[in-house]
């Protein structure tokens, strides 16, 4: 009965057979032990392969991309992909790239200068980790880039990786903080360091060097701004196809205000993407207009900015007392 049921519902994928239990049943040739494929090769990815990959990713909505390559050409392609997807395709994203092992600080700064992008970060230190055989091996910086991209993907938008711990078993080499790290930060390199309490990100920045705007330099601030754009766009999307009249104009303003209000809620009540208070609102100056078949929305908002520096001033005073 079981055999008939399997055959009737298998749709050609299963062919069950009832075997006489009194007959000897031998194992199939490929089940007597583990058999591994042999021959063949992984091959080497060329530029055209990477372009095919980035073209395929135009159909996928992701927020972070980390190409597993040390090639500056691939890094440039990744940045171009992120710029296009963010500005044209309305699927904002960012990339983190890494150089090869033994990259000097000077070479890393030169590579960051060549990119100079607000949507691309660059790391130049590899890390030690155990391979599948239990041997401690050095992973190249572009693997570190993938690790950091995964970390960014696992936190709320607006959360910086600055001072966050990295789960590795050592860094390729040590940096002096602030002698080496400040120079790297000023050069647009996302630096990692070894501290007394573990391995940490010094400052999660992009390779942007044109100015010091937070939404351009800080990955977390730019990510927060991207999330604001996505949220407001999603809130307004149901209005596409509706009548261009005063009622729709009013509803658009309500939808924008509501979406921004949610984004301004601090954690754990909301995402905490926007920062503000009663005297300094998280968003303001909402302007909605209709011109022909175009509904235009403009507003000002304050994406949350990470604390990167904590100066401490100590005033020493002599002790005096009377009795």
Question: Where do the PLM segments sit?
Answer:
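Short, hydrophobic/π-rich interface segment
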Residues: 248-277
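A glycine- and small-residue-enriched flexible loop/hinge signal that marks low-structured segments
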Residues: 1-243, 264, 271-277
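C-terminal edge-of-domain segments
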Residues: 284-323
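Residue-level marker of positions within ordered structural domains that often coincide
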Residues: 70, 261, 304
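Long, charged, glycine-rich C-terminal linkers/tails
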Residues: 267-294
